């Protein structure tokens, strides 16, 4: 595949801000985001929303970052360094969702924003308070350039169980009605299919992205990696459909390069680009 260009030595690369939680096991969250950004030629900036105590077996505890610290990190980055795109991951609670949305509006940010509505870990551990769903729908989604829910998240957000292409389109349309410019309903969790079909919708047209389903249990951080790769491509100037196409191909290669770690699920790995 064609990679995003790396800036020549001494030249400032595009910057992307990840607003997300920290994963002590290093498989997902801001740790996964920063790995992907570095290998896609962008400078990674972060605003940590929560510190998780987790490993490959699951999430043991979550410690939320205070509102003023979340807002302060975002403001410190964008008012000095500047960013060409941003993405959100784990936001943990309604107060953090509200803080991120209010800060985005107050700073009048207009760069592409990829919202990955993280609700639970791959083990099923909750990463978002149920009360925060309304905050996501009402405050953050209208700011999003692209919303990237998986099938479980789509069900929680719009109460549509995706079981086939028709229900996937219905979920995309219902999610788009909540305000994002584009919606990508990821089909990787649809186990009845031999492949992985993601559906991109802009309110008018649907775009389908198919990929081979890879037989690996080491897929921790796949959703984070996809959203971050899309944000990196947007920072490089890609259109949304082209950024999604790139992100899909990137995460497929990361799945091929995934490695075992600990006693649970290992992470997807962008380190193949170094070989």
From Swiss-Prot:
Its EC number is 2.7.1.49, 2.7.4.7. One of its GO terms (cellular component) is cytosol. Transmembrane segments: none annotated. The keyword Nucleotide-binding applies. GO terms for molecular function: ATP binding; hydroxymethylpyrimidine kinase activity; phosphomethylpyrimidine kinase activity. InterPro entries: HMP/HMP-P_kinase_dom, PM/HMP-P_kinase-1, Ribokinase-like. 4-amino-5-hydroxymethyl-2-methylpyrimidine binds at residue 54. It catalyses: 4-amino-5-hydroxymethyl-2-methylpyrimidine + ATP = 4-amino-2-methyl-5-(phosphooxymethyl)pyrimidine + ADP + H(+); 4-amino-2-methyl-5-(phosphooxymethyl)pyrimidine + ATP = 4-amino-2-methyl-5-(diphosphooxymethyl)pyrimidine + ADP. It comes from the Bacteria. Pathway: Cofactor biosynthesis; thiamine diphosphate biosynthesis; 4-amino-2-methyl-5-diphosphomethylpyrimidine from 5-amino-1-(5-phospho-D-ribosyl)imidazole: step 2/3; Cofactor biosynthesis; thiamine diphosphate biosynthesis; 4-amino-2-methyl-5-diphosphomethylpyrimidine from 5-amino-1-(5-phospho-D-ribosyl)imidazole: step 3/3. Pfam families: Phos_pyr_kin. SUPFAM superfamilies: Ribokinase-like. The keyword Heme does not apply. Keywords: ATP-binding, Kinase, Nucleotide-binding, Thiamine biosynthesis, Transferase. GO terms for biological process: thiamine biosynthetic process; thiamine diphosphate biosynthetic process. Belongs to the ThiD family. PANTHER family: HYDROXYMETHYLPYRIMIDINE_PHOSPHOMETHYLPYRIMIDINE KINASE THI20-RELATED, PHOSPHOMETHYLPYRIMIDINE KINASE. Was identified as a high-confidence drug target. Catalyzes the phosphorylation of hydroxymethylpyrimidine phosphate (HMP-P) to HMP-PP, and of HMP to HMP-P. This is Hydroxymethylpyrimidine/phosphomethylpyrimidine kinase. It comes from Mycobacterium tuberculosis (strain ATCC 25618 / H37Rv).
